[in-house]
Amino acid sequence: MSAEQAVLGAALLDPEQLTHLEWLAADHFYRPVHQALFDALRKLRNDGHPALSADGPLPLSWVTDAVEEAGQHVRGLTAAYAHTLIQACPRTEHAPVYGRMVLEGAIHRTVAQHTIRLHQAARADAVQGEVEGALRTADVLTGVLTDLARRWGTDPRPVPPTAGPSAATDIPPPAQSGQVAEDERFLLAVLAEQPGAMDEVVAWLRPGDFADPTHGQLYRCLGALHHRGEPIDRITLLWEAQRRGLLANGTVSSEQLTAVCEGMVPGSADWFGQRVMRSSLTRTAAASARAIRALAQDEVLGPGRLINHALHELGPLDEVRARWATANSSPAPKATASTPSAGEPPPARVKAARARSTP
C-alpha cells in the first residue's frame, strides 16, 4: 500500500514522472481510489493540462483537478488525502521503482485471482461431467501469465520451483465421488474381461489418470500384460499383480481383484476410459490451481519466478489435455477377428512368455 501511495505522490508532485510509468496500468493498484486517481492523472497529462506548461512551481490546480476528475468515478477521495499521498513519497525520481513495487503486488493478486477461477471451473466441470470450462479458464490463465511476463520484462518459460516439491503436494485432493470410483472399476472390468479392449485406451490413458491409486496399479498391470503381448483375463491380471507385490504389500487382495473383474457391465473401454480421463483432467486442473495459488501467496517469490513457476505447474494439465485431445480425435478401433482362439496361442505370445521365463 505504501508503494501505491508513493508512486501517486510522485506523480502529484512531478507530472513528468508519468512518462516513466507508461507500463503501469490503473488496475495494477489495489485500492479503487488509487486506480481512479492514477487514471485521472494520466488523463490530465494526455489532455495537456495547463500545469504541464507552466513556468516555476507546479500550480496547485494539478492536484485539485486530479482529485476532481477522480472524484467523478470513486467516492471518498479528498484534497486532504491527496496531500497525504504527497507526503508519502520520499523522492519523486524513485517513481519507476515504486511503480514496479505496485506491479509486483498486482502480479501476485492477479495470478491468485485467476487460479481461484480455474479451481472453481474445474470443480464445476467435475460435477457436471464436463471439461470445457476448466480448459477455457486454463487458457485465460496462460494468457494472463504471458502478458504479465511482458509487463514485468521477463521471458515466460516453465521453470520448476527449486525449493522442494510442488506446492500442491501438501494439499490433500478433494474427495472423489462414488461415480468416479465406479467408472474406474467398470473400466478395469471391461479391460480384463473383454478381448482387445486395451487397444482402445492404451494410447492415451495412463495409471495416473485413476483417482484411486489401487485402480491405477491394476491398470499398470494390464498395460504390462498388453505390452508383452500376453493374454489378459482375471487370472493373468492376478498373476501380474502378485508378481508386482501388490498382494504382498496389501495394495489389493485377490478378493478385491475378483470383485472388480466380476463387476463388468455393458459398455466399451473407450467410453469408460474417456469418463476416467475427463475426471483426471478436472482433477489435474484443480491441483494446478492450488499449486499456483500457493505460489502467488508467497510474498518472497519475485514476479519473474512466480510467473515461470506458475507456467511449470500448468505443465501436468497440458500433458493430460494433449492426451484428452488424442482420445477424442482417434478413430474408433476397427472390429477385427483378433480374438484368441481356443487353439494354440499366437507365436508372439509364446515367444514373449518363454523369453520372460528364461533365467
Per-range role (PLM):
Residues 113-159, 297-321:
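Non-catalytic interaction/clamp surfaces of large macromolecular machines
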Residues 122-125, 168-173, 223, 296-299:
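Charged, low-complexity surface segments at secondary-structure and domain boundaries
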Residues 1-106, 147-280, 335-359:
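Noncatalytic partner-interaction/assembly domains of nucleic-acid and motor enzyme complexes
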Residues 96-97, 107-123, 281-297:
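Long, amphipathic alpha-helical coiled-coil/dimerization segments that form elongated scaffolds
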Residues 323-329:
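N-terminal targeting/assembly segments of extracytoplasmic apparatus and virion spike/baseplate proteins
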Residues 34, 38, 112-115, 219, ...:
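Generic structural concept
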